[in-house]
Amino acid sequence: MSKPILGITMGDPFGNGPEITVRALNDKTVYDRCRPLVVGDMTSMAYALKVAKKVLGIDLTLNPVKDVKDAKFTYGTIDVLDMGLVPADKIPDTSDLDEPKPFGVGACALGGEASFQYVKKVIELAMAGEVDATCTNALSKEAINMAGHHYSGHTEIYADYTHTDKYTMMLAHEDLRVVHVSTHVSLREACDRVKKARVLECIRIANEGCKAIGIKEPKIGVAGLNPHCGENGMFGTEEIEEIQPAIDAALAEGINIPEKKPTPPDTVFSKALGGWYDIVVVMYHDQGHIPLKVKGFVYNKQEKHWEAVAGVNVTLGLPIIRASVDHGTGFGHAGSGHANELSLVNAMDYGIRLAENRKA
C-alpha cells in the first residue's frame, strides 16, 4: 500500500500553525508513514523555519510547488503548495533578536482570508482525490468573519464545501473520545438542540467513526444533559423525552450502548477512561472539550506557556478525511518559536490511520 498523501493547512499566518508545522515535519518518522504537503504561504513558512532554526537548531529546506505532482515528499524538505496570499512585509520580523518576539498581530482580515483559502484549497484537493486526508492547523473564527467568510469554524466550512448535511465533531486523546450533539452555539441554544433525531444521528456517527479507526465493536456512552440526568424529571426532562428515545432507537439498530440509558455527565468520562466506553456522545461543546483538555493540556505556570497541547479533532460524516489540532491560534505567543506541535502530530496520526483504513 502506498503511503497516503496528507494535505496540511498552515492555519492563520499570524498564529502558531507555521511553526507547529515546521516542528512536526522535523520528525523523520512522519515521512516513513505518509507524504505531507503543506497548503499555505512560503513567506510565513520561511519565517517559521528561520525562527525554528534559531530557537531549536532545526535545519530544513522548503520546496514551493503549485501542484501536488511537483512535491518531493522527502524528509529534510517541506513541500509547500504556495498560495501567495501573505506579503513578506506583513510578517513582523524579530528573528535577529536573541529571543524572537511574538507577532502581536492577532485576528485580522488578511490572516482570516488566507487561512480560509488554505482550507478551501485542501478540501478541493481531497474531493479531487489528489490528497488522501487533510489535517488543519488553527484558524481564527473572528479573523475569517472579518474577511467576510461567515462560518463558526473549520467543521462548518468542510460541511458546506463537501455538501454534507449530517456530520459531527469527534475529539480524541489517547483512550478518551467524544462526539458532540452541538458545538459552536450558545449554551441556551445547545439545550434546545438536544432532540431525539440529533442524538440518534450522533450515536450512529460515533459508532461508524470508531469503526473507521479500527474499533470493530464500539461501546458507546451517552451523556445526560442535566445534573444527575435530571433525577427523573426534577431538574429537566430532556433525558426522558429526547435522549432515552434516541438510545432505544440505537439499541434497536444493534448499536452497543452498555448502560442502555444516559449516563450522568460527572461520571461518564471516568467510565470511558476506565475502558467501559470507546467513545462518549456529549450534548454540547464544553461538556466534551473540558475533559479532553484536562487530560491532554499541561500548563507550566513558571514558564507561562503550555508544556503539552495534545488531542485531535476529527470531523465525522464527511466524504473526505479531516483531522485537526485541538487548540487555537495562540496569537499571544505565535512567532516566538515556542509553540507545541503535539496536537498536530496526533492529528496527522489520525489522518494516516483513517486513510489507511479507508484504502484497506
Q: Regions from the language model: what does each represent?
A:
Residues 149-177, 183-186:
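Flexible loop/hinge segments that line or gate small-molecule binding clefts
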Residues 156-165, 187-211:
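Active-site glycine-rich loop that binds ribose-phosphate moieties when present
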Residues 171, 313-315:
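Well-ordered beta-strand positions
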Residues 1-154, 199-221, 225-283, 287-312, ...:
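Contiguous, glycine/small-aliphatic-enriched amphipathic segments in soluble metabolic enzymes
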Residues 181, 316:
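Substrate-binding rim/cap in mid-to-C-terminal beta-strand-loop elements of soluble/periplasmic
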